[in-house]
Amino acid sequence: MGFNEKENSLEYWDNIHSKYERNEIKLDDWLDKFETIIDSCSTPILDLGCGSGNDTLYLINKNKQVISCDQSSNAINNIKKNFPEVYDTKCFNMLDGMPFDNNSFELIIADLCLHYFKEKDTFELLNEIRRILTVGGRLIFRVNSVNDVNHGAGQGNEIEHHLYETSDKRLKRFFDEKDIKFFFKGFDIEYLNEEIMTRYKLEKRLYRVCVKKK
């Protein structure tokens, strides 16, 4: 991702996360499917691309230690304000690498934050995730589906297979099952399912996935 693309992305998300209160954050039950995995995790859980803190709130409600991360300083400032009990926060762009030691986490959550990158950058990002996961550690995530027509699938300039440049010059990738198996071939895929949710009052199609470090 070039400099301008990174700047455009950061400006977009800083605007999205300008200000919100804890009572405005809505819980999403998508992680319930992995309750056993989450409940058995006794070490801090990494929440990548935490945004407004939906998953951070879910994990805190389960008495988990959470490290909430986002590239937007606005998002991180809101997390600190709304969740003073959060274990830790980090503000960084994932394309610059993960500021964590090898084998630091047994569980990483990445909700709708892994589908904004070119193929080369996606593989580098996943290599970083694999580096900081323990052997047998898991990454639980959701990504856009190629069927997500209400949220941009097939729209804009296709610069790579299933990767589009939006009208505001951001990148947005849409996955099918074959794409997920291609990008996550360095992991064992334990769960993979295309699902429907409501986002911004419109139907959204996405994949819910759990992979394990080999």
Question: What do these predicted regions represent?
Answer:
Residues 73, 119-123:
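Non-membrane alpha-helical structural segments and their capping/turn regions in soluble enzymes
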Residues 99-101, 118, 176:
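GHKL-family ATP-binding catalytic core of two-component histidine kinases
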Residues 48:
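Conserved beta-strand/loop positions that form the S-adenosyl-L-methionine
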Residues 1-42, 51-87, 91-97, 140-213:
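Class I (Rossmann-like) S-adenosyl-L-methionine-dependent methyltransferase catalytic domain
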Residues 106-120:
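A short SAM/SAH-binding and catalytic strip from SAM-dependent methyltransferases
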Residues 123-135:
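A short glycine-rich, Lys/Arg-flanked "PGG" loop and its adjoining helix->strand segment in the class I
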Residues 98-108:
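A short acidic, Gly/Pro-enriched loop at the edge of an enzyme's catalytic core
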